[in-house]
Amino acid sequence: MLSIDKNSFKRDYNNKFVQLHGKELKEGNNQQKYEALGSLVRDYVISTWMETNKKYNQTGEKQVYYFSMEFLLGRLLGDFLLNLGIRDICKEALRELNIDLEEIENLEHDQGLGNGGLGRLAACFLDSMASLNIAGHGCGIRYKYGFFEQKIVDCQQVEASDNWLREGNVWEIKKQDKAEIVKFGGTILTDYVNNKLTFTHVNYEPVLAVPYDTPVVGYENEVVNTLRLWSAEPVSNEFDFSSFSRGDFLKAISYKNSVEAISLVLYPEDSFYEGKMLRLKQQYFFVSAGIQSIVRHYKKHNGDIQLLDEKIAIHINDTHPTLAIPELMRILLDEEGLSWENAWRITQNTISYTNHTILAEALEKWPIDMFKGLLPRIYMIIEEINERYCEELWNKYVGQWDKISRMSIIGDGYVRMANLAIVGSHSVNGVAKLHTEILKKKEMSDFYYLYPSKFNNKTNGITHRRWLLRSNPKLTQLLIDTIGESFIKHPTDLENFANQLDDKTVLKRLGEIKKENKERLANEIYRSKKISIDTNSIFDVQIKRIHAYKRQTLNCLRIMDLYNKLVENPNLDIIPRTFIFAGKAAPGYYLAKNTIELICRVAETINNDKRVNDKIKVVMLDNYQVSLAEKIIPAADLSEQISTTTKEASGTSNMKFMMNGAITIATLDGANIEIKDEVGEDNIIIFGLNAEEVLNYHKNGGYSSWDVCNKDIRLQRVANDLINGKYCRDRDRFRSIYENLLTYNDEFFVLKDFNSYLEAQEKVNYLYKDTDKWQRMCGVNIAHSGIFSSDRTIKEYATGIWGSTVIYKNL
């Protein structure tokens, strides 16, 4: 915790402003005031950051490196003020200087270096590692542009570049002296030197990987870890003036542009060859730079490379960083001169892998020809890994060629990254109990029966510091007033709140806090969308990436059905509802973008129909990102977690809503099952097919969406409404959704679960009428949410996978 008084803070802030901008504070604009505040807070952090690194180097603690293509950090100023313990001092000091802290905080651009749950999980994990005094650091890419900025124009998603670095980034420090060379293409020459086979990489394209370090501040514990993001630059920044002078302008800039494209944007479109190549380049780029940097740092502060696995743990977040396995092998073999056996032992013991999906589209594989041309030495190493591994399979599964072919790392013209990740790591974990069981018994059963000890579960978590303390300060204060502060450092102590739920004054205050948060969100919605919403209505919220398996379509069809009922019976006995959606569709994913348009057209129709718009309204918010989620989640009454059972690995928004006192309506998918186990069946609303039923349909067939539709007049009507011009004069506008549900037999069982979903929504309507009962349910969810803190998750990773057990003071 930083020790500073208000007057000292004011003095430091004034000095920093003058130093940065060369004028008095009263002459500055808000952007300049934000830059001065951010720079000052970073200055406060730097000395602790240096001390933390010094301590790690001196004590020889095991270092954990978390590799991820995504880090969805959001805004950092509020995090740092909270974790340093100076938010109140800062707020009061700025108030005396006629500066509104919240207004200044809102000027910070979200660091949107992620697409959704994968990147947000990585950010939560970094926060927990620092707060638990674990020597854990992030490794990723410093994208010049984030995923994209989403605008809804004429009901359609329009993608604009997310230029998050436009105003600079006050938190990062460029470490040019720590840059690494990453090699692409070229040829591998082999030779025997002293009776040993050697490999020399020639005629390659060199790329300079330059690290930018961002501090990760632990909660009031004087620990600051590091997020290192790599930026691609030409090896020489000298401009090719001779080519330019000769008029060869394209040659002068083409190399620079091709290199900088590597760290230009998250997830370039990969439906064409060049896009696939760029993605593969990105993955090797940050993995190679990161592994080289780790080994270099290890050798500087330790001695024997043979003991690397005792001092270093490398964790790969999904399959994107899987090339860490052959890259570490390359360094150990080619640069350190280790034998294959020793290098393989160290690599396996060092690397662990989290699987995040069972969707086939997300299990990466790369064409051999592309891979071999771009990464010739890495391909040679993977070939050798595969040959030795397949020999093991041949000895174990004699004559079972289909199984061996299925399990091989190289097959059918592709390099299979998930197979490589399993074979080359010592631990493979799923992210919820159901997900892990599906991996073990179905999707990766061949590997589980070969390597049962590798597989384990680590249910995801969220940092309660951001998603409760920061996002919902009034609820946090109620919790402190009723159960004390211990839950801040021991989140499972939230369970003590259950003992307060017989106190009607506590329930009343819970309701008041929710109402205040709803009013705050309603103001934001009016500001951005010019839609007035009733804060006495149920705020029914589904905010997440738009994807068929997440079933925003099911939610939308339910709203269309309710609209039909209200038009026919305006006196229908329902509590008014506001349906709130937010989420981005991948630029190349037409069905998801079409779903956004459907939601917006339905919203347009309902919100302009005076017969019903005092009962229901629909809002689709633009540009979903962390800072927007922080406003929506505390205001939600109902959390829609309605993915097709078996398809959502875990989910984390379900945990955020739960912690903020929303009731979950859910399928028995991912972590929803574990939420149900914690709160009990009376405090969550469950519907739909279970895992066994879904898996049975997948295995044996027998599902006909036409039959389901033809037996339900409500479904027939809403299905026809998709193509009869009701929501768009172009009757074919939503035909792809219609055909996805009926012609192509409804892959994600939207129609099958429709009736069960409507029955569950009726239950919501009934329960909400009993205010005390509803508030008690909210309180039970809050009380049982502590187990879903990422602190619990990280402790399990540290002790069960990484072998990092150093958890120090204040805990």
Give the ranges of each region predicted by the language model.
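A conserved ligand/cofactor-binding region detector
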Residues: M1-L811
